[in-house]
C-alpha cells in the first residue's frame, strides 16, 4: 500500500523502514495521507488538512484512560450488548477494530478480545498503541493477556479463526451525521485512508457462523440494519444501537 512515510524521531535508526517492510507499505512522496513516526508514537495525518492533527492509538492516556477509570465499565452499552453478566466474560472477536476503542473497553472489564484489522496502516497504528500499552506499568499486565491484534481481512479470517469466540463484534464504517469534532476529524481522515465499507454486509453471515453465542453490530441510530437483516434484540443508546443476532452453538 502506498502512503507518504515521514520520520520525525531524528534517531536515524531506520525504524521507519523496518515498519514499512513489516506492514507492506511503500513510500509515496505525493500521497495526501502520511504515516509519521514521532518521538512519542506512530500517527496518521491528512497532509492537505494539517489542522486535523495526527490520529494515533493511545490505550494508556487521554480519552481511553479517562474512559477506563471513570467510564461505565460493565454498565457501558457495548459491555451490556456482548452479554457480560456476573462471572460471564465472553471471548470476543472484534472484526472491525478501527482504533480499538470498543475492544479496549471490553478488555478493561475482563473480556479476552482478538482485534481483526485488514488495512495495513490502521493495523500499524493499533500495533504501535498495543506495544506502548503492553509496556505500561499500570495496564500492561492485563492488556497483554486480553487484547491481541490479528492483521487480516475479516471476510476471510472469520471463516478460520480458532478457537471460536462466544461473541463477534462488528462496527462497520457508516457515514456519520454527527458533527462532533472528534468523530468528524477521525472519520474524515479515516475515510480518506480506507474509503467506504462497501463489503460490510458480507460480514454478518460468517460472523454468525463463527460466534458460538451472539453477534453484536454497532449502528448509528439512523442506519438500516446490517445486510438489511432486522433483529428485535438491541441495546439502544443516544445516537447508536447495538443490534444483537444469534450465533451458531458448538
UniProtKB/Swiss-Prot annotation:
Q: Which UniProt key words apply to this protein?
A: Cytoplasm, Methyltransferase, rRNA processing, S-adenosyl-L-methionine, Transferase
Q: Name one GO cellular component term.
A: cytoplasm
Chain residues that bind S-adenosyl-L-methionine? 101-102, 117-118, 153-154, 171
Catalytic activity, EC: 2.1.1.242
Primary location class: cytoplasm
| InterPro entries, per the entry | 16SrRNA_methylTrfase_J, SAM-dependent_MTases_sf
What SUPFAM superfamilies does its record include? S-adenosyl-L-methionine-dependent methyltransferases
User: Which top-rank group of organisms is this from?
Assistant: Bacteria
Q: What is its biological role?
A: Specifically methylates the guanosine in position 1516 of 16S rRNA.
Q: Matching HAMAP family, A to Z?
A: 16SrRNA_methyltr_J
Protein name per Swiss-Prot or TrEMBL: Ribosomal RNA small subunit methyltransferase J
Source species of the chain:
Shigella flexneri
Recall the taxonomic lineage recorded for the source organism: Bacteria, Pseudomonadati, Pseudomonadota, Gammaproteobacteria, Enterobacterales
